[in-house]
Amino acid sequence: MGRLRFVVLLSIFPIKTFSEPCYTMALVLRDSIKISEFINLSAFEKLLPSALTAVKSVRIPKVDKIISYENDTLSDIDLLKGVKLVENGYVCLAGLVVTGEWNLPDNCKGGVSICLVDKRMKRANEATLGSYHTSACKKRFTFKIIPNYSVTTADALKGIWQVMTNIRGVEMEKGFCPLSLEFVSICVVYLNNIKLGLREKILNVTEGGPTELTEAVVDRFVEKVPMAARLKSFRSVNKKKPSNSSKFVNGKSRLNSRNKLNYENGDSDVGTSVVDDIVVGNGVSDIRIDDDCESFDAQSESY
């Protein structure tokens, strides 16, 4: 029905690199952003140069402007614009703060639903990172989403995040903007996953027993099947896979043990597997063997 325009914040606010200038954010979001609500940096990470820590920078990047023309819209959004990423590294979307303001008179009916989407995920419930619902009578609103997960730099450069909006009950002519939204993301850029992968603290290790950790980082469906059983099942399935038959090994034919024994005993009838012809040319023997004859695979059995 109406046109929905997203007016997004254009600002960059470096946290870790103190030598760079800091730019002031819009007043709408200035009091809403608290880095400590999303991430906790240690004293070493705050004071040491980025070259000596896993965390390279913590930034609030500038965001693109998005314009929507219909009630239901799904638009790409660049939450990392202006952020210097690390090649072959990672970026963590620690949080997202959204502030909206209705461009309507007081006591208007209707409302809006806003959702942050990861378009890589095929299942809708897994692609939804967070959502918010509000009515048009609430002139200004602010909410935050904490995705708190990392993606590779290569994936981040493809623009994997989207914003879905759904406006209902707002009676406005086409070509006008009923709602303005500002997006500010908090992201952490780092070179490797080791730091974030060592969150667990080992409490107890016994010989032949499981390792006891303080944090459950494995999904429930994985915990139901021990990894040793998974490995055994995986190997057994691979061994049962049929291999391609080969009639020749190093240019020589292979006879099965039964036919070979009959041949050595002077029996001219070698069963159903009969050598029809031998043609020698350029050192290669062309021997035709029936399908019932055993064959050998010259490929390695290792995997």
From Swiss-Prot:
GO terms for biological process: transport of virus in host, cell to cell. It comes from the Viruses. GO terms for molecular function: RNA binding. The keyword RNA-binding applies. Signal peptide: none annotated. One of its GO terms (cellular component) is host cell plasmodesma. Keywords: Host cell junction, Host cytoplasm, Host cytoskeleton, RNA-binding, Transport, Viral movement protein. It is found in: Host cytoplasm, Host cytoskeleton; Host cell junction, Host plasmodesma. The keyword Glycosyltransferase does not apply. Belongs to the tobamovirus movement protein family. Transports viral genome to neighboring plant cells directly through plasmosdesmata, without any budding. The movement protein allows efficient cell to cell propagation, by bypassing the host cell wall barrier. Forms a ribonucleoprotein complex with viral RNA. Binds microtubules and modulates microtubule stability. Can bind double-stranded DNA. This is Movement protein. It comes from Odontoglossum ringspot virus (isolate Korean Cy) (ORSV-Cy). The lineage of its organism: Viruses, Riboviria, Orthornavirae, Kitrinoviricota, Alsuviricetes.
